[in-house]
C-alpha cells in the first residue's frame, strides 16, 4: 500500500471514530423521583429505572416514546456542585413526558441521573445521542 492510500485510510478511520461525538446534541438534564408509573407512554407498565421523561425539545408528539438515548454529563449549570460528573454515560428509554416548564431537555430517573452526576447538582449540562 502506498503512502497516500495509507494516509487516506488512516484519516477515514480517524473521522469515523469522531462521528458519534459530532452527532451528539447538547442540552440539560434534571431528575425526578419514584414512583415512575403511571407514565405518558406506558401507563402502569413498569419499564425499570433507567428511564427518562422527554421535554418538548424531543417529545415529538409521543414519537419519543421508547426511544433510547445515551446521556453523558458535561458539567455543572450552577455554582452549587462545581464538578458533578462521574465520567460515565447512561442509556435511558423515554417513558414519559416532562410538560411545559420542564427544567431540562431530558428529565432522568433519579437512578439514571445518579449514575452520571451527583444528584446534589440538581441540573447538569449534557450531551445525548440516539
Label the predicted regions:
Residues 2-130:
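Secreted/periplasmic proteins
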